[in-house]
Amino acid sequence: MRRKNNNKIWIWVATLILSISALYGQKINQIAQIVGIRDNSLVGYGLVIGLNGTGDKSGSKFTMQSIANMLESVNVKLSANDIKSKNVAAVMVTASLPPFARQGDKLDILVSSIGDAKSINGGTLVMTPLTGVDGNIYALAQGNITFGESGSTLSGTIIGGASVEREIAYNLYNQENATLSLKSSDLQNAIKIQQALNDVFRDAIAVAVDARTIKLKKPENLSMVEFLALVEEVEIDYSRKERIVIDEKSGTIVAGVGITIDPVVVTHGDITIKISDEMPDDPEAIKLEDGTMMSRAQGTISSTNGTKPTVSSVVKALQRMGATPRNVISILESMKKSGALNADIEVM
């Protein structure tokens, strides 16, 4: 009988969520996470074998000792001083253990050289235990390493290269309370989540306690799993902070199309760039996009349609001036500090 009532409540709340979602824009699970349910970092020390003379040199004593220890585990006894191999490299292996991962699940891993190897390309990672901060082994890693397009052959990945051996227990079912944590602190968004949840469930089940934290109390007729599943689907009118994400290795820059830069002059090394609302006095000025003009001779970027130059236009201009990804990062950070750029910058 109770299960029937629960089903009715579930359908009623889900219907209410759909009707309210039309008024809002961002799901809670996209901007907040449930405290305690998170990824856990794993790390391990291992050896990559099968290298064509590009491994660690004999001067890397920890590598030679590790080889000796590995051989001893299969009843081959040698002193570390007797090993002269260049086909092996010592590496650190890292992975992320997602919540609710089960034994046998596969994890992607990152393998990075820590010795003086020239390259670990073509190598195979020997079985490596991956431990958590508590010292327990949660996964075993092994496999052939693949590399991206960055050009580096000292750090690579193995897709599905680790197998989960130990699970992290999450006791949700019998819980009565939970906590949401916003990914970015914002008082307005915390209050919006509180109001949206209380509207959906028609009860005071959510209380914002600060700019990041919302306390939740489960309704009596729902399990915690059912409750959190519904909470994650509720949408709010999210107040978004503009953000620029930069991958320094690849040079990739991701920014919202509407992020603009106010007039400013920045000098970084040999590069001087001026953001202006006046047309450059240069017949060889280049048109970039959205009416933005760039004068290479004057180091000026300006807009011809009355709007401010966008981050995209400025980045393209800097690249034409020969700026490296590191130069671009430094210049954008200087613009942010001066107040000309109103956006958070995240460097990966």
UniProtKB/Swiss-Prot annotation:
Record keyword Iron-sulfur present: no
Localization per record: Periplasm; Bacterial flagellum basal body
Extent of the signal sequence: 1-24
Molecular function per GO: structural molecule activity
Entry keywords, A to Z: Bacterial flagellum, Periplasm, Signal
A biological-process GO annotation: bacterial-type flagellum-dependent cell motility
Organism superkingdom: Bacteria
Xref: InterPro entries: Flag_FlgI
GO cellular component: bacterial-type flagellum basal body, distal rod, P ring; outer membrane-bounded periplasmic space
Alphabetized HAMAP family for the sequence: FlgI
Function: Assembles around the rod to form the L-ring and probably protects the motor/basal body from shearing forces during rotation.
NCBIfam families named among the record's database cross-references: PRK05303.1
Family per record: Belongs to the FlgI family.
Subunit structure: The basal body constitutes a major portion of the flagellar organelle and consists of four rings (L,P,S, and M) mounted on a central rod.
Record-given protein name: Flagellar P-ring protein
